């Protein structure tokens, strides 16, 4: 007898007042609105067919193109090196980087919402701000969401460029006065010192890359270092985490 149950999908969309919109995707690419500009970028997970005709895709202000080992953005005249946009009532500096990234991951918004809810519930219950550690903090989306909700946040990244970018985003979002510690360091090295100090955190946020700079000439490789990272993270987690 055939199973008549229909497979249900859960699709999340951002509020229309936000500056981001996924316009179309397919054939290994995605077309996105980032504030005032439309970007076309590769996305290997977009295995389906595009819905828009090529004319729609041709309206992109910048397109990330790979030719062999070379990759670069093809930009229309007067395309800016930087602009700002709103996302989840936070403000971000957007740039087209050499790795096709823009400085934010809009798909993380649902997690920011969940984090804020957890933090606000904890504050309502215990009348005390939880302490959150954000490792591989990048440009600070999760850091800003947690700080806005009332948490004390320690933001760690091995890239000075990312740290500076995150701090500018905090300024743009009006959160410069929030209790955020900005730490330029390798995640594992930082955790080892925190373990020795006996420091504890009520929540940990981690979005490690597969491969990256770990500072001081070291290299991060997720297949080699992730298990150690999790072990260290467990040691700094408080007895009453969020």
Residue ranges and their predicted role:
Residues 3-21:
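Short, Gly/Pro- and small/polar-rich lid/capping loops
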Residues 36, 130, 202:
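Conserved acidic residues
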Residues 127-138:
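Conserved class I S-adenosyl-L-methionine
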Residues 139-153:
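Conserved SAM-binding loop of SAM-dependent methyltransferases across substrates and taxa
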Residues 159-205:
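S-adenosyl-L-methionine
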């Amino acid at each position: 007898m055939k199973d008549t149950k229909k497979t249900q999908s859960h699709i999340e969309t951002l509020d229309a007042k936000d500056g981001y919109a996924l316009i179309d995707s397919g054939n290994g690419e995605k077309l996105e609105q980032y504030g005032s500009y439309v970007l076309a970028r590769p996305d290997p997970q977009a295995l389906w067919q595009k819905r828009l005709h090529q004319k729609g895709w041709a309206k992109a202000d910048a397109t990330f193109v790979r030719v062999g080992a070379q990759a670069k953005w093809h930009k229309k005249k007067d395309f800016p090196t930087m602009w700002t946009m709103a996302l989840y009532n936070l403000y971000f500096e957007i740039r087209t980087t050499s790795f096709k990234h823009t400085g934010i991951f809009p798909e993380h918004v649902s997690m920011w919402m969940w984090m804020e809810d957890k933090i606000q519930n904890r504050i309502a219950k215990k009348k005390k701000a939880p302490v959150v550690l954000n490792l591989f903090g990048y440009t600070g989306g999760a850091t800003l969401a947690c700080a806005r909700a009332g948490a004390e946040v320690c933001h760690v990244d091995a890239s000075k460029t990312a740290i500076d970018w995150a701090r500018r985003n905090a300024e743009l979002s009006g959160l410069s006065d929030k209790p955020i510690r900005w730490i330029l360091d390798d995640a594992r090295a930082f955790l080892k010192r925190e373990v020795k100090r006996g420091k504890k955190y009520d929540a940990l946020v981690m979005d490690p890359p597969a491969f990256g700079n770990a500072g001081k000439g070291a290299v991060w490789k997720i297949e080699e270092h992730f298990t150690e990272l999790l072990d260290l993270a467990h040691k700094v987690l408080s007895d009453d985490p969020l």
